[in-house]
Amino acid sequence: IDALDFATAENEPDALLDVAVLDGVLIFLGTESVEFWGATGDPDLPYAPIQQRVFEQGVIATGCVVVVDNSFVWIGADGITYRNGEVPVAISDDGIVERSKASASHRLWLLEDERHKFLCQRHDGNTMLYDVTTGEWSERQSYGRSNWRAGPGLGDDETGTIWELDGYVDAGGVF
């Protein structure tokens, strides 16, 4: 790969925090915007920005976007949880937004349990779950804690060790 082959956000050049892929479209989530890039068919420039397809609401932190049911959900920089459509649609209520704004850390992951998909949104002192099927929010806690101990994880195919999913380390070593 040529070191000069790179691309940057073009419609709204802001700091990139997260990336998702939905139906072959790359979704770049920055601090202030969400930008969509589609396949071009050109081997020298396989993806390019989709013109007029930008959301003017960025993501709050890395690890705060999930692809679910032919859409994606992210925690916006304003603390509101959004689901995409032609325009972003807020799915969080005022209570969820207040918890998000008051938190210094944020995490979003998907959990499937008994035919229900839940978006798990962790803040400093609480974990809120959004049932994708019913559209209802609930709170989960572990015994003796204000927060739920569960989190996103991966299993090692050789040792069976469970790792916490993190974008910066691999079993304690840097990627």
Residue ranges of predicted features:
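Beta-sheet-dominated scaffold domains
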Residues: 12-174
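A short, charged helix-loop
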Residues: 1-9
